[in-house]
Amino acid sequence: MSKPIEGVSEKIETCAKKEFLDKGYVDASLRTIAAEAGTTTGSIYSRYGGKEGLFSALVEPAAKEFTEIFVSVQEKFQKIEPEKQADYLDEYAENGMMLMLDYMYDHFEIFQLLVDGAYGTNFKTLWNI
């Protein structure tokens, strides 16, 4: 088996992100992505296993981290004594929401893919992460 050429995966992912943003998952073409990246569809299949694997490689890291932020906020809130939770609910809700919104804007294109371009994937709803 040949060794992957350095920089090709990054080029594929850049071109894939553009194609998925432009056309959504269902209408995106691996041939177009490969041509734009200057490689072959075989190269994409060997690296990612196919279109769904490529889409997952783009969105899964950010989706998992987003979920971890959400869970972390919930866990911190649960550590507050139950009788004091009502006093801190607004603060935790606002701070947690801001953390999640900041993260989404820091990874805006990825969340565009999740919201607008994920139909046909396991990511069609954020809760499938």
Regions found by a protein language model. Name each.
Residues 1-5, 78:
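N-terminal intrinsically disordered/low-complexity leader segments
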Residues 15-22, 65-76, 110:
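Solvent-exposed, amphipathic alpha-helical segments
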